[in-house]
């Protein structure tokens, strides 16, 4: 007997499970199809396991700098298998919690791969092989790491998934690709004592981000001892039993492992799009409107496959928007205030427009930077390097963008995200009492400096 649902979601990653929960809470009969583990790449093979390892690396960093706090450590060892075990325990615990959430919302979970048979039918192949009917379908099949052209992933040529499965630390690691993923792993493994070489084809790393951010990270990495090769051309990658040889700029270099971090490819080739008449472009991206609807009125697409921002928090919000529209509430996706974070050391976070982007839109904008060395809490933490920057409208004082390089940037960016989303002005920030001593004071101080009324920094002459 064919099961019928109001809403069927294919893929249980950050976009899919959030869409399913939102739909179920709107009283829609909801099914969620997943071939692997709930949580998708983010929980199982990306965001969470990498941040669990980074947490361990941060402990190492604190130990290395313990003497400045009057604490003398007589030596330490890095038990990487134990770090990896903790990472797996963290992931398992969160996944179990997620599975409980899905059950508590009375969502029907079907194990297997889902593909479209028509615009209202989905075939499931796997543990729960069946064909189900749905009034609405949400595609949330995500993406996967892109291999280097002509070089498949292997035991030594690793994707971002493969490197998280290592149980021993390499001595020498090459990272092909100086984007966010490449830089995060470079920072992580360098802190753990691995010799790192970042190989980037463009003339600078983090090429898609703010130029000042790129230069700052380059300077920090170089100072830390991370080797960066830009304008690099790779002509060969050869794997042997114990090493990988890379020919870069006509020079042969040897490494224990290679991480390929050159982007991701979209999982849309085998989900039956043609059977339902759903359009995708040459990259595999499924075009959607502001409600996440595809060209087929009852089929929606969310997450990486929309080709917007390949970020878990964007995917989740797209899931909410799609489910809300299916349940009869007209809501649209707003990309004006999307925070992005780079979990290097130091952390980096940004949201909204850069000064260059604001000027390209012919906005009368100004950039104000406030240093952490003038923030008491940062000095007390021994983390006074870096700054927070605000891009504001010179006439209206509306906050247009912000970025921060320094301690706990990933948490600090939330205030500016709220400000930009709600079109707040500089006075909205500095007239709000910020607790002292906290790092968040950097925004109040920065907003005051932008109006040339700084309290803890010399005024501009």
UniProtKB/Swiss-Prot annotation:
Its cofactor is FAD. Binds 1 FAD per subunit. One of its GO terms (biological process) is 2-oxoglutarate metabolic process. Disulfide bonds join 42-47. It catalyses: N(6)-[(R)-dihydrolipoyl]-L-lysyl-[protein] + NAD(+) = N(6)-[(R)-lipoyl]-L-lysyl-[protein] + NADH + H(+). Keywords: Cytoplasm, Disulfide bond, FAD, Flavoprotein, NAD, Oxidoreductase, Redox-active center. InterPro entries: Class-I_Pyr_Nuc-Dis_Oxidored, FAD/NAD-bd_sf, FAD/NAD-binding_dom, FAD/NAD-linked_Rdtase_dimer_sf, Lipoamide_DH, Pyr_nuc-diS_OxRdtase, Pyr_nucl-diS_OxRdtase_dimer, Pyr_OxRdtase_I_AS. The active site is at 436 (proton acceptor). Coiled coil: none annotated. One of its GO terms (molecular function) is dihydrolipoyl dehydrogenase (NADH) activity. NAD(+) binds at residues 177-181, 200, 261-264. The active site is a redox-active disulfide bond. Belongs to the class-I pyridine nucleotide-disulfide oxidoreductase family. The branched-chain alpha-keto dehydrogenase complex catalyzes the overall conversion of alpha-keto acids to acyl-CoA and CO(2). It contains multiple copies of 3 enzymatic components: branched-chain alpha-keto acid decarboxylase (E1), lipoamide acyltransferase (E2) and lipoamide dehydrogenase (E3). This is Dihydrolipoyl dehydrogenase. The gene is lpdA.
């Amino acid at each position: 007997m064919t099961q019928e649902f109001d809403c069927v979601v294919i893929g249980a990653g950050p976009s899919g499970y959030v869409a399913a929960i939102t739909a179920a809470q709107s009283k829609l009969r909801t099914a969620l199809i997943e071939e692997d583990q709930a949580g998708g790449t983010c929980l199982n093979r990306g965001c969470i396991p990498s941040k669990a390892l980074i947490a361990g690396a941060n402990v190492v960093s604190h130990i290395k700098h313990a003497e400045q706090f009057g604490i003398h450590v007589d030596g330490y060892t890095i038990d990487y298998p134990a770090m990896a075990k903790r990472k797996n325990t963290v992931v398992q615990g969160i996944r179990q919690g997620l599975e409980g959430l899905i059950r508590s919302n009375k969502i029907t979970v079907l194990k297997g791969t889902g593909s479209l048979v028509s615009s209202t039918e989905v075939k499931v192949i796997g543990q729960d092989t069946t064909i189900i009917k749905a009034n609405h379908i949400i595609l949330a099949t995500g993406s996967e790491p892109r291999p280097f052209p002509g070089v498949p992933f292997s035991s030594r040529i690793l994707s971002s998934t493969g490197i998280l499965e290592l149980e021993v630390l390499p001595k020498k690691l090459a990272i092909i690709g100086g984007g966010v993923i490449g830089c995060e792993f470079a920072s992580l493994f360098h802190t753990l004592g691995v010799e790192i070489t970042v190989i980037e084809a463009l003339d600078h790393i983090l090429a898609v981000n703010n130029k000042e951010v790129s230069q700052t990270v380059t300077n920090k990495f170089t100072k830390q001892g991370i080797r960066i090769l830009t304008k690099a051309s790779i002509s060969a990658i050869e794997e042997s039993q114990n090493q990988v040889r890379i020919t870069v700029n006509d020079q042969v270099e040897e490494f224990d492992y290679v991480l390929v971090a050159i982007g991701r490819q979209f999982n849309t080739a085998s989900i039956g799009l043609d059977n339902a008449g759903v359009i995708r472009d040459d990259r595999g991206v499924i075009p959607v409107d502001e409600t996440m609807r595809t060209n087929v009125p009852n089929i929606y697409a969310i997450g990486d496959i929309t080709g917007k921002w390949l970020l878990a928090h964007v995917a989740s919000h797209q899931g909410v928007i799609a489910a809300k529209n299916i349940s009869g509430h007209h809501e649209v996706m707003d990309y004006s205030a999307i925070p992005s974070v780079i979990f290097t050391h130091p952390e980096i976070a940004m949201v909204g427009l850069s000064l260059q982007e604001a000027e390209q839109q012919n906005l009368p904008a100004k950039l104000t930077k406030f240093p952490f060395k003038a923030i008491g809490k940062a000095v007390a933490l021994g983390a006074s390097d870096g700054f927070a920057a605000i891009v504001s409208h010179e006439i209206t004082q509306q906050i247009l963008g912000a970025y921060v390089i320094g301690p706990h940037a990933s948490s600090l960016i939330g205030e500016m995200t709220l400000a930009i989303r709600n079109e707040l002005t500089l006075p909205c920030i500095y007239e709000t009492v910020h607790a002292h001593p906290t790092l968040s004071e950097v925004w109040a101080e920065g907003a005051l400096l932008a109006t040339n009324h700084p309290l803890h920094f010399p005024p501009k002459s």
